[in-house]
Amino acid sequence: MSKKHMKGNGGEVPENSEMSGSEELVAVEPGEPDYRELLARKEEELKQSQDRLLRMAAELDNTRKRLEREKSEGIAYANEGLMKDLLPVLDNLERALEHSENEADCGSLVEGVRMTLKGFLDSLARFGCTPFESVGNAFDPNFHEAVMQEEVADYPERTVIREFQKGYTLKERLLRPAMVVVSKAAGDT
C-alpha cells in the first residue's frame, strides 16, 4: 500500500483510510499554490471592490443632489444682477416723489411718478424682490449699514431711527443692506 504526504495534522495517512467528520485533507504538491488561500484573497479583493463601488455610488448620488440644489438656486437667483442695477432707478423715483410733494403745482407729476413707482415695486415683488422695514427696528449688521449715530430720547439704544436708502431682499437673500442712522445713548462718543 502506497502512502502520500497529506497536508493536515502533519502525519502520514494511508491512501485508503477513511476520514472522520468534516476534516478534509488536500494533497499539496511542493510549489503548487494553495487554492484556499488564493480564494480567500480573491474574496477579500471582491469585498473591497464592492465597498469602493458602494462608496462611489453614494458619492455620485450626493454630487447629483448637490448639482440639482445649485441649479435650482441658480435659477432662483439668476436675476440678482438685474435687480441690483434697477435699485438706483427705484431710489431716484422715490427721491423725485419726496421733493415734488412740496410743490403745489406738480400734483399730476407727483401722481404719475407715484403710479410708476407702485407699478415698479409690484413688478419687482413678482420676482421676489421686496424692500424691508428698518426704522424702529433694532440695528442688525446683517441687514443694515450704519452711516451715522445720533442721540435720540424717543428710541432705545442701537435702534434704526432714520433710513437714507432702503434695503432689499431677493426671495430670502439680502440684495442690498439699508443705509441707516442708529440711535445711541446720551453722552456716548
UniProtKB/Swiss-Prot annotation:
Source domain of life: Bacteria
Annotated transmembrane regions: none
Cleaved signal peptide residues: none
Any GO MF annotation of the entry: protein homodimerization activity
Keyword Cytoplasm among record annotations: yes
Tagged with keyword Glycoprotein: no
UniProt-annotated location(s): Cytoplasm
Main location class: cytoplasm
The entry's keywords: Chaperone, Cytoplasm, Stress response
Record's GO cellular component terms: cytoplasm
GO BP term, example: protein folding
Region (Disordered): 1-31
Protein family: Belongs to the GrpE family.
Subunit structure: Homodimer.
Function: Participates actively in the response to hyperosmotic and heat shock by preventing the aggregation of stress-denatured proteins, in association with DnaK and GrpE. It is the nucleotide exchange factor for DnaK and may function as a thermosensor. Unfolded proteins bind initially to DnaJ; upon interaction with the DnaJ-bound protein, DnaK hydrolyzes its bound ATP, resulting in the formation of a stable complex. GrpE releases ADP from DnaK; ATP binding to DnaK triggers the release of the substrate protein, thus completing the reaction cycle.
Name used for this protein in its record: Protein GrpE
Species per Swiss-Prot/TrEMBL record: Syntrophobacter fumaroxidans (strain DSM 10017 / MPOB)
Gene: grpE
